[in-house]
Amino acid sequence: MSAALLPSPPRRIVVLAFDGVDAGIVQTMMAGGRLPNLTALKTRGGFSPLTPPVPPQTPVSWTSFSTGLDPGGHQIFDFLKRDPSDMTPTFAVAQDREVPFLLGRKTPAAAAAAVGTILLLPAAVLAGRGRRLAAAVLFLIAAGAAAAAFAAARAWLPATRPSIESNRRGTTFWSEAVARPATVMRMPVTFPPESFPRGRLLSGLGVPDLSGRIGKPAYYTSDPFFAPREGNDFSIEIVRLESNVGRQTTRIVGPPGRAFGRAGAIELPVTLSVSPSRDRLSIEAGGSRLTLSAGQWSDWTSLAFRVNPLITVHGYARFLLETIAPEIALYVSPVQFDPERLPPGFDISAPPGYAKELLRRFGRYKTMGWAIDTWSIQSGTLSEPAFLQDVAATVAQDRRMLRALVKEDRRLLVHYFEFPDRVAHVFWRFRDPKHPAYDAALAARYGDVVEKSYETMDAIVGETARALPPDAALLVLSDHGFATWRRSVNYDSWLVEKGYLVLRGNAQRQNLEALFSRGAFWEAVDWSKSRAYAMGLGDVYVNLRGREKDGIVAPGADYEKLRDELSRGLLELTDPKTGEHAVSRVFKRENVYRRYDPRLIPDLIVANRPGYRVSWQASLGVPTGSVFEDNRDVWSGDHCSLDPDLVRGVFFASRPFSSSQVPGITDATAALRALLSGKASPGPIVWR
């Protein structure tokens, strides 16, 4: 199915990458006339549904697109992975490591030498001119200053600092010679940023907030009866205020103290003052002062966390005063890193100064990879209107950047938008009357929000298409589609029920904070009797001898027999409430990945039918006792553990193409590389 490219390769290519756009919804909306710009793009070039990889998760799918490899090849196979030496879950995208801070243990001596040298030079000059007394005084001052510098550096500068190393393997298409010069904006799994010739990149999913988390918002409340939804599984910083009137002092949590050899987190004192009329709240945080009325957002506010006299970590956040009476409800966004004052060695762009350049051109923007806060609306600390306001502000800033970047004469521009995915995750409940969290009154107001986010996408596509010259090519794609999540399934509970996972006590509930702080997992498991365990979003592992720390299943025939047995049992798993099978397919890793690390990649990958998804506790490896339970959560739509064929994304192109079958996302990579190089496309997407 290969053919020569006709006409010649486009001089410029723009790729708009939208997260979580579902092929079925797009086709329905195009048929109804609600997506005129995508319809025009389809007419001009072409459209096809796009199948995500196994599993259809955001970091997995976008990394497959970025590299053209399947998850076994690029090794980003889930949000979470485990270390087989102790089964501790960690984030799969990147791993922590320690690197020297400045010169490491030599820093104090270097500081002393630098200070001493600066002062000794004039002393030497004075001595040479015969002014011995003045020279002697300066020599003494130099010695004292050098000693003070040594002591200060030793006391206040750490020998090492935390760093992050990407787990992604493979070569990205934008780093190849045919793509240069290239600009890449916010693509997932691009942190830490990698420099490439004539390239500019702003990192996306993977960049933490100032606390070192994927995103840690805060909620300040004077309501003594407030309780976050779902037991605060997403680890919102809940701060209890002593009063709903007058003046009081609290704090904002900043960077982790362990980065600087301290226990706990670095905190910034904050003073809150309620006006006598109880219609305004004044906030003092370091050198920043602002006053808000109920329902008002602040601008980005500078926050400086002083670690010691030598180190200050700079960031900024937005405040939202949801209510002031009868009780204070103050939301503080995750604290973003300030691109103008990043910590030493911490880069969020390539080249390192590009993030600062963007800030100076466009103003402050969200540097955190998961930019839109979906945790607070789930926890009941952010309302639906406030969430949509945050989405609108985030999208508006990204569109400002895109409008300017698309005018630059560069061979390739890749621009990623996350908002369709984030909106669908938390507003799906209003478009599914059968969902346990469906609310008819709220559905009348928010039932069309997902479709409206698609209309926003369509508008972005339209303004981009109009800004491009006729000889440019425009590609629009998404990493996966979406489905309702009505019922949660816990594979660890099923493994316990069937005797594959043996407990010696009750398993403790876990949350994101335990994940970040390396909490204790699996304490209730008796590994000497357990043959299998589950973790992540559909990953099942055999407790394999020679791989797992306490593995008991022999490699070879016993391993294969157990995998077959588990696969049959999971395919037969029936929800007693609905009578439906929860599992669509069970994949063996060798059947979906061309190559893989057998110590890293799950032995089985379980794919759900629409309506079902792995529960949050199951993703952390916690058997809760119930195999099935209603999902009454705000997070009501999903894709992560579903069958990829049932949650397809989209692929549009301004150039005509044909396809012999429904392409996968790596086929889109191959087609893009063909456009860039001018060589024949290997198919199934063939340029006409």
Question: What do these predicted regions represent?
Answer:
Residues A114-L140:
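Cytosolic-side transmembrane helix boundary signature
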Residues G611-S659, A668:
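Low-complexity, glycine/alanine/valine/leucine- and proline-rich hydrophobic stretches
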Residues P7-R11, F18, G33, T43-T51, ...:
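Secreted, luminal/periplasmic, and some membrane-associated catalytic domains
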Residues S2-S8, G24-V26, L388-L413, V423, ...:
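A long, amphipathic alpha-helix that forms part
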Residues P10-Q27, A40-K42, F65, E176-A177, ...:
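Beta-strand elements within well-structured catalytic alpha/beta cores of enzymes
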